[in-house]
């Protein structure tokens, strides 16, 4: 619990510090608004602490078990379908992706969420197949980067500007513990 508190503080305190510096220097605000901000920041830290703790407690054991069972199955088609579905669903549940979708007015929310979730599903399949067949990472990158550049040249500009940022939001508190545990399993 203390470790999760430290993680939450590390994520939120810099932002709180910047906001407070701005409030006391160039953008003064009423005391009532400042107190609301401070209370909200404390609740945010506590909420993040419990959320990441719960996500890790739930996702890590589940991911390890699923990963173990997947590697024991001999049907590649089952592995492919399950990995895609797991990557897709776990990404849709990612809170950071929901926030990003709300921040991009030029792309409908569901379009962005589905596109990112599909990408994670596809690349989770690729990662699991790479592990199962012992394919070197360099070979995968030599194949996948040209595909990414070709796709980047044909998608709408509005979509492209958000595409690379979207990769960052998939490394949130839901996706990372699950996918890492899946790989360990």
Describe the residue ranges of each PLM region.
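Membrane-interfacial loop-to-helix junctions in multi-pass transporters
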Residues: 33-35, 69-79, 106-115, 153-155, ...
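Juxtamembrane transmembrane-helix boundary signature
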Residues: 44-62
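N-terminal membrane topogenic signal
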Residues: 1-13, 74-75
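Helix-loop-helix junctions within the multi-pass membrane cores of secondary transporters/permeases
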Residues: 76-148
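Flexible loop linkers connecting adjacent transmembrane helices
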Residues: 56-74, 99-103
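Structural signature of hydrophobic alpha-helical transmembrane segments
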Residues: 37-49, 106-118, 166-179
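Hydrophobic core segments of alpha-helical transmembrane domains in multi-pass membrane transport
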Residues: 13-26, 40-50, 82-89, 119-130, ...
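Short, hydrophobic transmembrane alpha-helix segments
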Residues: 23-35
